[in-house]
A protein has these predicted regions:
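Hydrophobic beta-strand scaffold residues
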Residues: 22, 139-140
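Basic, flexible linker segments flanking DNA-binding modules
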Residues: 1-53, 147, 202-211
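An active-site-proximal beta-strand-loop segment
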Residues: 47, 51-86, 92-93
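Mobile genetic element proteins and their domesticated derivatives, centered on retroelements
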Residues: 11, 15, 45, 61, ...
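Active-site beta-loop-alpha junctions of metal-dependent nucleic acid enzymes
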Residues: 66, 70, 88-112, 127
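C-terminal domain-tail junction helix/linker
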Residues: 136, 160-222
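Conserved, non-catalytic sequence blocks in retroelement Pol enzymes and Pol-derived host proteins
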Residues: 2-3, 49-50, 67-68, 122, ...
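RNase H-like two-metal-ion nuclease catalytic core shared by retroviral integrases
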Residues: 31-35, 120-122, 128-130, 142-162, ...
Length: 222
């Protein structure tokens, strides 16, 4: 962030000297299987991951989290403009209601005053009639069959939260998993973690800069 450039080898040397171990991603596991191969489900987003304003494109996905008591499932919605996680829900099942709850949280928190695309895979939760009703005023976009790269940003986030945080713990149960996710998202990822996409600002800071610049431009325009 301060403009210092060093090689990966130098970073590795410093990490060894400081006793810091790298965090590795565990093998990817499928949580939602494509359930609708209809050609009616179009990939409107088409890997255009850099919208020019907030609330232009949201993307959503579900990932599993291992606990001693059994798996729990994290549903997240990301605003692609800032890579901010604008809503999330942790559940003990993969029912469609978990996705709907997350969408309702996002709609309550964000000001949707222009066309909005919401992108997901073709899992059963995202093609259900309840999902279509919850997103009836949005443009629904779907990844191609068995092609997770079409939803790369949210897939990457779920990998990051596990690699950087959750994999450090032997999580006991739902309650501990919820606490850990809350701490990471609300006290770090959205507020402090810098992102190259955001010009090395946090998602919250990136959105604040946009709002300030946008407001100033409107004032100058009269």
């Amino acid at each position: 962030k301060t403009g210092e450039v060093i090689s990966e080898r130098t970073v590795g040397t410093y990490m060894r000297q400081m006793g810091i171990r790298a965090q590795w991603s565990k093998p990817w596991t499928i949580t939602t299987k494509d359930s609708d191969f209809s050609t009616e489900l179009q990939n409107i987003l088409d890997e255009q991951f850099n919208p020019d304003r907030p609330n232009a494109v949201w993307c959503s996905d579900i990932t599993y989290i291992w606990t001693i008591d059994g798996f729990v499932y994290l549903t997240s919605i990301m605003d692609l403009f800032s890579r901010k996680i604008i809503a999330w829900t942790l559940s003990e099942t993969l029912e469609v209601s978990c996705v709907i709850d997350t969408i309702n949280k996002a709609k309550a928190r964000r000001n949707i005053d222009q066309p909005l695309i919401i992108h997901s895979d073709r899992g059963s939760q995202y093609v259900a009639k309840e999902y279509k009703k919850a997103t009836e005023n949005m443009q629904r976009s779907y990844s191609k069959k068995a092609f997770p790269w079409d939803n790369a940003c949210i897939e990457s986030f779920h990998s990051v939260i596990k690699r950087e945080w959750l994999n450090r713990f032997k999580i006991r149960d739902y309650k501990q998993a919820y606490q850990l996710i809350f701490e990471y998202l609300e006290a770090f990822y959205n507020t402090k973690r810098i992102h190259s996409h955001c010009n090395y600002m946090s998602p919250n800071e990136f959105e604040r800069v946009y709002e300030r610049t946008h407001t100033e431009a409107e004032l100058l325009a009269g």
